[in-house]
Amino acid sequence: MSSPSKRREMDLMKLMMSDYKVEMINDGMQEFFVEFSGPKDSIYEGGVWKIRVELPDAYPYKSPSVGFITKIYHPNVDEMSGSVCLDVINQTWSPMFDLVNVFETFLPQLLLYPNPSDPLNGEAAALMMRDRPTYEQRVKEYCEKYAKPRADTEEMSSDDEMSEDEYASDGDDEDDVAIAGKLDP
């Protein structure tokens, strides 16, 4: 195993052993999803985003590619593709950093200190500079609409499944029989 390959494996294991939920995309160790929570005491607090990470062949000498799968309203994140302004990580990346640094330092810094002068989302950048309270409200609306904590979304889906099961097997069956009886000639 080559040195970059060993390093990739070690960094990925370290990330998996941390508090972050990691979901591999393929059998390899190059692409995966990570759940990332908004920094405390920020307008992003309470939000949980699914982040796609791609490790280049030259990792750790070249920075990972990071993109938001979950929608986020931020000047340095493209709203449609989820791409993060590459300068955020590339300019400061060093092989001394690892994947945990991306989620404990780089992304929190990105959310805490947006740079509206180098935007990927021009609308968010303009709103942030023109009307900060409205910008912050929009961020919170996106958090509420798209970045609900995973536990809440799991509960909602299991409730939805339960209501479908109830519809198919419980009291609604009696209604179905009654309706079917009324419709028969």
Curated annotation (Swiss-Prot):
Expression (tissue specificity): Expressed in developing ovules, but not in vascular tissues.
Catalytic reactions of this protein: S-ubiquitinyl-[E1 ubiquitin-activating enzyme]-L-cysteine + [E2 ubiquitin-conjugating enzyme]-L-cysteine = [E1 ubiquitin-activating enzyme]-L-cysteine + S-ubiquitinyl-[E2 ubiquitin-conjugating enzyme]-L-cysteine
Alphabetized UniProt keyword annotations: ATP-binding, Nucleotide-binding, Transferase, Ubl conjugation pathway
Documented EC number(s): 2.3.2.23
Region called Disordered, residue ranges: 146-185
This protein's pathway: Protein modification; protein ubiquitination
Protein's GO biological process: protein ubiquitination; ubiquitin-dependent protein catabolic process
GO molecular function terms attached to this record: ATP binding; ubiquitin conjugating enzyme activity; ubiquitin-protein transferase activity
Function: Accepts the ubiquitin from the E1 complex and catalyzes its covalent attachment to other proteins.
Family: Belongs to the ubiquitin-conjugating enzyme family.
Protein name: Ubiquitin-conjugating enzyme E2 5
Organism classification: Eukaryota, Viridiplantae, Streptophyta, Embryophyta, Tracheophyta
